[in-house]
């Protein structure tokens, strides 16, 4: 089973690489616009940020520029995953059109920017839970993984200008506190909880 859907032909008839769609969704029930809320509980989205650089600090314009790599993880119990690899299971762009992605924005950037827009992201499935054999009705043998036991992992890259209110009354001995603010779209705030994990500064110290 481990050799099924591994992008290599291990069977002489090549049947091990047929029907290898990684995501199974009941299209008549799955509604992409709605978060994966279950039994009245909110969807937890775990957030980490790598700050790759901070540049172009402009006190007069009250802005700074930052290059970011952002990590988001959540689970969607409405999805079944198939034949997951332990080494990475990246989703094609076409699949991203059919699954729910967190509607998150930078609220203090120049213009509210959607963090999870397709042009900025990659999405991977992390194999964490145990496998289950396909149902007997399935024509192709393989393993299934439950959406509530395996994380969806989204990585986003952005370089943007952010607003910051600089306090200059003690210049040049001042210390400024600026932020990068991430918000959930208003209509979904009652269904989603952002869970901060860590933030790393990977740029050059000056």
Model segments located where?
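Activation on extended, non-transmembrane soluble regions of large proteins
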Residues: 1-7, 13, 45-48
